[in-house]
Amino acid sequence: MNDVSRIFPGFYIGSLPAVNRNTLDKYQITHVCSVLNEFQPKWTKIYKYLHIDIYDSPSVDIMKYFDKTFQFIEEGRKDGGVLVHCFAGISRSATICIAYIMRKLNISFEDAHGLVSDARPIIYPNESFIKQLKKYELILKKNRENPQIVEKESEEEDDDEDDDDDDYDSDEDDDDDSEDDDFEEEFDNVVKKKNNNNKKVNVKNTTKVFSNISISSEQTTTSTTTVPTPTLNPETKIEETTTTTTATATATLVEEVVESTSPKATLGEHRYSCRKCSKDLFLDFDILDHEQGQGQTSFKWNKRDNTTCNKSVGANGEQIEDQNKVICTSYFISEIEFSLSQTYSGMEGKLFCPSCNEKLGSWSWSGEQCSCGAWIAPSFQIPKTRVDEKKVLK
């Protein structure tokens, strides 16, 4: 299921079904910002995730995440591409995208909302999120009108970086800032012109402008012997540091990519086929790992008489949990081709063998509970009794 909308180059918004290998690789997405509750990131060795665990509720303070998501999106656009998604791609993800554009382009909430709406017409942030975005607009405006404090802080950070790195080139940084100033001036002219016509920014008329956006107006450009390496600290601010050990960093990245794409990692040790017709369905690599739940004690509405079924007696006579007795009876697989092809409508349904049409399991975008008690969302669940496990011939 391909539910991705491009806002501008390297910046996408979508829904939960968009988080699958085919879509992420198709749009060259390297960073995924997941703004939804109870989400378990997948393929963390291949993609970089930022999980904002919040509900789409008026009581949620989403504004406190704007700085963190801004830095993450900047990093993602620099490295390749970034996808911001929530469950439906309507409220939470749209709010994060609007906040990013407001700060990145120094424009109003109305103009930023227009840009995201042109890319994805179904967006509809809840009223509380809109109020927070308008409050954020006032904060950004205040910072622009009183830049001395911000500039002073930036100068202090730059001084610290100069002490650590003698190869820092301030002239190139000035050139980078001037390029962003030129873009902002050109964009302001476009906005003023379009505001005379229903006060709406037309993405078609500003495509060329967006293509010239520098990846980060706040990043430091270094000389050819150094490379800026952004690091996300606990306070959600990215400190720009420079390093001359690019060969080591590159080698490490290559090793990770080779490891994740090697035949051994791709195939795994086993393949799994339909028990009825022996049609190959998925591999070890497609099975999702999850933290084991507490077994029957996770089901609140029944089996209360078995709350101690997974406990044994320790040396001191105390009851201890025996996790080895909690067994997962199903495989939860990732969004591979055969499973995604059966999710063309609705929020949940059954999974069938593509060859003999035998029922294999079920799928649900909202998630299902494993027999061990863990909640998996989204879920593509196949009971182990429906498939045969076979060795992969190499």
UniProtKB/Swiss-Prot annotation:
Pfam families: DSPc (PF00782). It comes from the Eukaryota. InterPro entries: Dual-sp_phosphatase_cat-dom, DUSP12, Prot-tyrosine_phosphatase-like, Tyr_Pase_AS, Tyr_Pase_dom, TYR_PHOSPHATASE_DUAL_dom. Its EC number is 3.1.3.16, 3.1.3.48. Residues 2-142 form the Tyrosine-protein phosphatase domain. It catalyses: O-phospho-L-tyrosyl-[protein] + H2O = L-tyrosyl-[protein] + phosphate; O-phospho-L-seryl-[protein] + H2O = L-seryl-[protein] + phosphate; O-phospho-L-threonyl-[protein] + H2O = L-threonyl-[protein] + phosphate. Transmembrane segments: none annotated. The keyword Phosphoprotein does not apply. Has a dual specificity toward Ser/Thr and Tyr-containing proteins. Belongs to the protein-tyrosine phosphatase family. Non-receptor class dual specificity subfamily. This is Probable dual specificity protein phosphatase DDB_G0281963. It comes from Dictyostelium discoideum.
